[in-house]
């Protein structure tokens, strides 16, 4: 059955999970947690050339309005409690993108006494974007991968 037949009859069938996940992928509101030079590339991704708005990504200033956190840069031991506090203030469901080598595993500062060796020790990470610093294209690819992950989740029907 072609799409013309569906439109002529006036109805489309789908599951509630697919509908909910489709709406979630089209309205990702990230909380920016820019800690170092990776934040500049995150700003590039939000600017006119790459325009994350076309993916439904709108940066929000408050964690209570966000459902995605992008951790970009070196996470220090003093900043780790603040990262966890902001994560806890975000509404469910929430996702985390770790952007850059420093956020993924400490990066260049891996052996420093004051650096957390990966933000996944503080918050659960869904998508890792590698690079030092990763390009805006890499962040967009990470957002697309997060959208694909959200589409695969079961929100209502739990498979046993």
Swiss-Prot record:
Entry-linked InterPro entries: NADH_UbQ_OxRdtase-like_20kDa (IPR006137), NADH_UQ_OxRdtase_20Kd_su (IPR006138)
Record flagged with keyword Transport: yes
Family: Belongs to the complex I 20 kDa subunit family.
Cofactor (UniProt): [4Fe-4S] cluster
Protein name: NADH-quinone oxidoreductase subunit B
Sample GO molecular function, one term: quinone binding
Residues bound to [4Fe-4S] cluster: 37-38, 102, 132
Annotated Pfam families: Oxidored_q6
Subcellular localization, as worded in the UniProt entry: Cell inner membrane
Species whose genome carries this gene: Cupriavidus pinatubonensis (strain JMP 134 / LMG 1197)
Domain of life according to the entry: Bacteria
HAMAP family membership: NDH1_NuoB
Membrane topology: Peripheral membrane protein
Keywords: 4Fe-4S, Cell inner membrane, Cell membrane, Iron, Iron-sulfur, Membrane, Metal-binding, NAD, Quinone, Translocase, Transport, Ubiquinone
Biological process, per Gene Ontology: aerobic respiration; electron transport coupled proton transport
Enzyme class: translocase
Function: NDH-1 shuttles electrons from NADH, via FMN and iron-sulfur (Fe-S) centers, to quinones in the respiratory chain. Couples the redox reaction to proton translocation (for every two electrons transferred, four hydrogen ions are translocated across the cytoplasmic membrane), and thus conserves the redox energy in a proton gradient.
PROSITE patterns xrefs: COMPLEX1_20K
A GO CC term assigned to this protein in UniProt: respiratory chain complex I
Enzymatic reactions: a quinone + NADH + 5 H(+)(in) = a quinol + NAD(+) + 4 H(+)(out)
Oligomer and partners: NDH-1 is composed of 14 different subunits. Subunits NuoB, C, D, E, F, and G constitute the peripheral sector of the complex.
EC number: 7.1.1.-
């Amino acid at each position: 059955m072609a799409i013309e037949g569906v439109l002529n009859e006036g109805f489309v069938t789908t599951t509630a999970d697919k509908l909910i996940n489709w709406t979630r992928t089209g309205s990702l509101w990230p909380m920016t947690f820019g800690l170092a030079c990776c934040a500049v590339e995150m700003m590039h991704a939000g600017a006119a050339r790459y325009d994350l708005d076309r993916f439904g990504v709108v940066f929000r200033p408050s964690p209570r309005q966000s459902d995605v956190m992008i951790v970009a840069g070196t996470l220090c031991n003093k900043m780790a409690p603040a990262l966890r506090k902001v994560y806890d203030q975000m509404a469910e469901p929430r996702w985390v993108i770790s952007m850059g080598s420093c956020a993924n595993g400490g990066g260049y500062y891996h052996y420093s006494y004051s650096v957390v060796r990966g933000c996944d020790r503080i918050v659960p990470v869904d998508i890792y974007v590698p690079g030092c610093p990763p390009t805006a294209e890499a962040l967009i690819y990470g957002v697309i991968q997060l959208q694909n992950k959200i589409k695969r989740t079961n929100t209502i029907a739990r498979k046993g």
